[in-house]
From Swiss-Prot:
It is found in: Endoplasmic reticulum membrane. Residues 19-223 are lumenal. The keyword Signal applies. Residues 55-65, 75-128 have a biased composition (Low complexity). This is Uncharacterized protein P19A11.02c. GO terms for cellular component: endoplasmic reticulum membrane; external side of plasma membrane. Residues 55-128 are annotated as: Disordered. It is a single-pass type I membrane protein. Keywords: Endoplasmic reticulum, Membrane, Signal, Transmembrane, Transmembrane helix. It comes from Schizosaccharomyces pombe (strain 972 / ATCC 24843) (Fission yeast). The chain crosses the membrane at residues 224-244. Its main location: endoplasmic reticulum.
Length: 244
């Protein structure tokens, strides 16, 4: 049973192989015929490129042919001297045409109109006007608009940091500071109160009264009396006794 199946399988394989071998129009060598085609194209381009360099020599040949054409005017000059026609033209000019030509010569008035046309063409004056329209005066104004004066003002305004030159007030008292109590006369060198004011360097600081500081005269200073000191000592002793 298995042997018969194997034989049928082998027969089927050989039939398929035979069918593919004898199929009309089926060849496996098609790809080998396509490969050698692109080779001869390189030789064609080199031959056509070398022949183009010979075109420059053909131009010089045509230029020599043009110079050789110059002699024909000599033959045409001979053809213009037709000796026979002038005799017939002499007869025709002695009849009517000269009178008409005299009339035409008297009508030479048109050149006057030609003179008028040349005078009307004069407007080069408008050309002079266009040159003056250039106004260079506005160009001068633009250069003066640069104003360097403002630049000078900014540079002179820079050195305002001169607070260190403000003089302190010595031996004085503020009125609003000490309202009651005893003044200490040993106070010297009171600091300036309005330190926010800034002076330029060009202005010397001379007026010291602008700092809102008034000096109290010596007669207004209240000195400590002996009775006041005794009262102070009694108050201190009573305070310590109370605390003890």
């Amino acid at each position: 049973m298995q042997f018969s199946v194997l034989c049928k399988f082998l027969l089927l394989v050989t039939a398929v192989m035979a069918q593919t071998e004898y199929t009309p129009g089926f060849t496996t060598d098609v790809a080998t015929t396509v490969t050698p085609t692109p080779l001869p194209s390189a030789n064609v381009t080199t031959t056509s490129f070398s022949s183009a360099s010979t075109e420059t020599s053909t131009h010089s040949v045509t230029s020599t042919n043009i110079t050789s054409i110059v002699p024909p005017p000599s033959t045409s000059h001979n053809s213009t001297t037709t000796t026979v026609p002038p005799t017939t033209s002499m007869n025709t000019t002695t009849t009517v045409p000269p009178t008409t030509s005299l009339n035409t010569t008297t009508t030479t008035a048109p050149p006057t109109t030609h003179v008028n046309s040349t005078t009307t063409v004069v407007p080069p004056t408008t050309h002079v006007n266009t040159t003056t329209v250039v106004p260079p005066t506005t160009h001068v104004n633009t250069t003066t608009v640069v104003p360097p004066t403002t630049h000078a003002n900014t540079t002179s305004f820079v050195p305002t940091t001169t607070e260190s030159s403000i003089h302190p007030i010595t031996t004085g008292f503020y009125n609003t500071t000490f309202t009651t109590g005893y003044f200490n006369t040993s106070v010297t060198s009171v600091a300036v109160h309005n330190s926010t004011t800034v002076f330029p360097t060009s202005v010397p600081i001379v007026n010291t009264t602008s700092f809102n500081v008034t000096t109290i005269p010596s007669s207004a200073v209240h000195y400590a009396s002996p009775s006041g000191l005794l009262a102070l000592v009694v108050m201190l002793i009573s305070a310590f006794a109370f605390l003890a």
